[in-house]
Regions:
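Short, basic, alpha-helical segments at the C-terminal edge of helix-turn-helix-like DNA-binding modules
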Residues: 62-67
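Hydrophobic alpha-helical connector segments
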Residues: 59, 70-103, 153-160
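N-terminal intrinsically disordered/low-complexity leader segments
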Residues: 1-9, 20
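Short secondary-structure transition hinges
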Residues: 87-136
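Helix-turn-helix
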Residues: 13, 17-59
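Conserved amphipathic alpha-helical interaction elements at protein-protein interfaces in regulatory
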Residues: 20, 24, 52, 74, ...
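Residues in soluble alpha-helical coiled-coils and helical-bundle/repeat scaffolds
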Residues: 51-55, 76-80, 97, 101, ...
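Hydrophobic/aromatic-rich alpha-helical bundle segments in the mid-to-C-terminal region
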Residues: 100, 118-124, 128, 142-194
Length: 195
């Protein structure tokens, strides 16, 4: 009797393996051989599900973004304004092992995106979606009287996103200087200053 294979499950396993290799060893180390080994499959199995390495990498990035969106949707369900903004921004910081892996993955793709229009398009799309969500939550908070700032909300949005990116990068690069609790404290101070 032939073995029944769940193709979606196998693709997901390969993408999960790709994310682990990238987060642990970097994007350059994410060869098809390394990804196949991490997943426990042969290179031939990867070729059956993906046309090339770039498709695996791009799919791994998209899958990571989708997982983040799903997790965030659960966290902010029924929450609006400043409380939802707080959750959204904290969720984008590497405050636990899962989010640290996601941040390492994301940062690994940043430099590659400078040379790949295809990757850059994915990054721009995701950044625009996040930017719009932050801007909308700021507008909700302002309308609800939760913010006292007179600053342009587009500028506040850029400031908050730059803060999250900077704090995340600093934690990855200088773990001896910053702790996760420091990131949370600094971000929450900035949000409190908007009240």
């Amino acid at each position: 009797m032939p073995k029944i294979v769940d193709h979606d499950e196998r693709r997901a396993e390969v993408l999960s393996a790709a994310r682990r290799v990238i987060a642990r060893d970097g994007l350059d180390a994410a060869t098809t051989r390394a990804i196949a080994k991490e997943a426990g499959y042969s290179n031939g199995v990867l070729a059956h599900y993906f046309t090339d390495k770039d498709e695996i990498l791009l799919s791994a990035l998209r899958q990571s973004h989708q997982r983040i969106r799903e997790r965030l949707a659960r966290k902010v369900e029924g929450v609006t304004g400043l409380a939802a903004l707080r959750e959204l921004l904290l969720d984008n910081l590497p405050l636990d092992a899962e989010r640290t892996q996601e941040t390492r993955l994301e940062v690994s793709f940043w430099s590659r995106s400078l040379a790949s229009e295809r990757l850059a398009d994915v990054q721009r799309s995701e950044a625009a979606e996040l930017r719009a969500a932050v801007r909308d939550l700021l507008a909700q908070a302002k309308a609800a009287g939760e913010l006292s700032t007179d600053q342009n909300l587009d500028d506040v949005t850029e400031h908050l996103l730059a803060l999250v990116d900077g704090l995340s990068l600093h934690l990855l690069l200088y773990p001896d200087r910053l702790r996760r609790v420091d990131l949370e404290r600094i971000l929450l101070q900035h949000l409190d200053n908007l009240r």
